[in-house]
Amino acid sequence: MSRIGKRPIPIPAGVQVELTPDNVVRVTGPKGQLELRLHPKMIVQRENGVVQVQRPSDERFFKQLHGLYRTLIANMVQGVTEGFRKDLEIHGVGYRAALEGKTLVLTVGYSHPVRIDPPPGISFIVESPTRIGVVGIDKQLVGEVAAQIRRVRPPEPYQGKGIRYAGEVIRRKAGKTGKTKGKK
């Protein structure tokens, strides 16, 4: 039995989990609604305020799906109650971020400002010109948008300039050493 897959998912107050006959799990909560289509043979049961994921057999494929689906459903429940947030930091002289309406505008050393429109369900928070927050209810989409922002100007290893995740450690490299005069 999968150690992760066998753990029940508690359903908090104000959250509704709906299981359709065509194996779609729909989670609705105060922040919105998320859907997940499951493999047709996987079994999801809801009873006594918890959701339990079960697999049809002990085949390797179903063992893999067991823990995955349990975690995805748990993330959906957490997303519609608390939401998810990924923070980014901007390092570099003159590098900054700003919001124009809902659009994120990045000035990161290019000849033009880079504009990023949020996909549906995602919003940006600019706490300071060097800190960006990506907020939403879908964990995968939040991470994807944060990675897309980081990709605009990834941190470089010599001076550390660029956009990085909050708390991310960048491995630094030593620069070139100069030639000594007189010796050949």
UniProtKB/Swiss-Prot annotation:
Sorted alphabetically, the Gene Ontology cellular component annotations on this record are: cytosolic large ribosomal subunit
Q: How does the record describe its quaternary structure?
A: Part of the 50S ribosomal subunit.
Query: Matching NCBIfam families, A to Z?
Result: L6_bact
Top-level taxonomic group: Bacteria
Q: Which GO terms describe its biological process?
A: cytoplasmic translation
Q: Which Pfam families match?
A: Ribosomal_L6
- Protein name per the record: Large ribosomal subunit protein uL6
> Which Gene3D superfamilies does the annotation name?
Ribosomal protein L6, alpha-beta domain (3.90.930.12)
Instruction: Cite the entry's keywords alphabetically.
Output: Ribonucleoprotein, Ribosomal protein, RNA-binding, rRNA-binding
Q: What protein family does this chain belong to?
A: Belongs to the universal ribosomal protein uL6 family.
This chain's function reads: This protein binds to the 23S rRNA, and is important in its secondary structure. It is located near the subunit interface in the base of the L7/L12 stalk, and near the tRNA binding site of the peptidyltransferase center.
Q: Which gene encodes it?
A: rplF
Signal sequence bounds: none
What are the recorded GO MF terms, alphabetically?
rRNA binding; structural constituent of ribosome
